Design a protein with these regions (language model features):
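Family-specific signature for flavin-dependent thymidylate synthase
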Residues: 1-347
Length: 347
């Protein structure tokens, strides 16, 4: 089995802790926890609870799994003949629509790749049902690789542990990823004119010699007006700070570029909204009910992941000259960070 590509190690400045760069992510599983904690504004507790990911999975908050990604080229067992490649290709496509399946009949391989949520569906339901399609050693390596990337999402089955106590496959994979993690430098963060942070948390290497990739961003300090537009790009994956769980008292906001009189009216209105929200919370109104009055100008943070076609669509749509200025500025930064020159509206 050949791994199609490896996962880049992200390094991040935590906006809630300080401005100094810190190596927060040791393995891709850490990106999942970070995305989950963004929802609850609990990033200061990052990596303090070993079972955080298990809790997320147990309550089926599975969107955070979509921030992890893995891909493999698998050898199909030759005993099934040439037609087996097409058979397995169609079987996998029908059963696992959220995994991306590529057919490489000349190389006698099938490419399987997708986010950790798609892999988790396969892992939880019926890994054994595809066991016979591929070589036993390949399947063992696939399971061990996924486990090394996200051990709390893909725990190694007990039967495989006993079979591989002295097996070098897992050790080699672990050392390979550890070397890649140690070789990364710095983090990539840009600040918009309104003070929002655009952070590239991670990006895969090119997939099998193509221009395909998977990337994860965090947008911090953007308005809800921007995030409402962002989530329209449904092919991407999102984990957003929750107004249901995060208290909105004295919320910050983003002012649009309007005339001074309008700005003063906006500020006065937001001051009134803040007072009403605070009064409701003092009367023990739940956050999930009090949030009904929070405006689109309220600041939020969101983690966004996706493959190259999702990011390109976002770039093409949101860098257009008639795009809303706040999201256009973010999209232009994303385009530059990704080095994606295929967007139709370069600045």
């Amino acid at each position: 089995m050949e791994k199609i590509y490896t996962i880049t190690q992200p390094i991040l400045s935590d906006p809630l802790i300080g401005s100094n760069p810190r190596k927060l992510f040791h393995i891709p599983q850490d990106v999942l926890e970070w995305g989950g904690r963004i929802c609850y504004r609990s990033t200061p507790k990052f990596r303090t609870s070993p079972d955080f990911i298990q809790k997320i999975i147990s309550v089926e908050h599975l969107d955070v799994l979509e921030h992890g990604y893995a891909g493999f080229l698998m050898d199909v067992e030759e005993e099934y003949g040439v037609d087996s490649y097409y058979y397995f290709y169609h079987q996998m496509n029908q059963k696992y629509p959220y995994l991306r399946i590529d057919l490489h009949p000349t190389a006698k391989k099938i490419g399987i790749y997708g986010n950790f949520r798609a892999w988790h569906q396969l892992y939880e339901n019926d890994f054994t049902q595809i066991w016979g399609m591929f070589g036993r050693k390949d399947m063992q390596e696939l399971i061990l690789t996924l486990s090394n990337l996200a051990p709390n999402v893909f725990p190694v089955p007990s039967w495989l542990v006993s079979q591989n106590e002295n097996n070098s496959i897992g050790g080699e994979i672990r050392r390979e990823h550890a070397m890649q993690m140690a070789n990364q430098k710095g983090f990539n963060c840009r600040v918009t004119s309104s003070g929002a942070n655009v952070m590239l948390l991670g990006k895969t290497n090119a997939i099998n010699g193509t221009d395909r990739y998977h990337a994860t961003f965090q947008f911090n300090g953007i308005s809800r007006a921007l995030s409402h537009q962002l989530v329209r790009h449904r092919v991407l994956s999102f984990s957003q700070e929750s107004q249901r769980y995060v208290d909105g008292t004295n919320f910050q906001y983003v002012l649009p570029n309007v005339d001074n009189e309008s700005k003063q009216e906006i500020k006065s209105t937001i001051s009134f909204i803040n007072e009403v929200y605070r009064n409701m919370r003092n009367r023990k109104v739940k956050k999930e009910d009090a949030r009904c009055i929070l405006p689109n100008a309220a600041v939020t943070q969101i983690v966004v992941s996706g493959e190259e076609f999702g990011w390109r669509h976002f770039i093409e749509q949101r860098t257009a000259s008639d795009a809303q200025p706040e999201i256009r500025e973010v999209a232009l930064i994303v385009q530059d960070m990704l080095g994606d020159k295929n967007g139709s509206n370069l600045s």
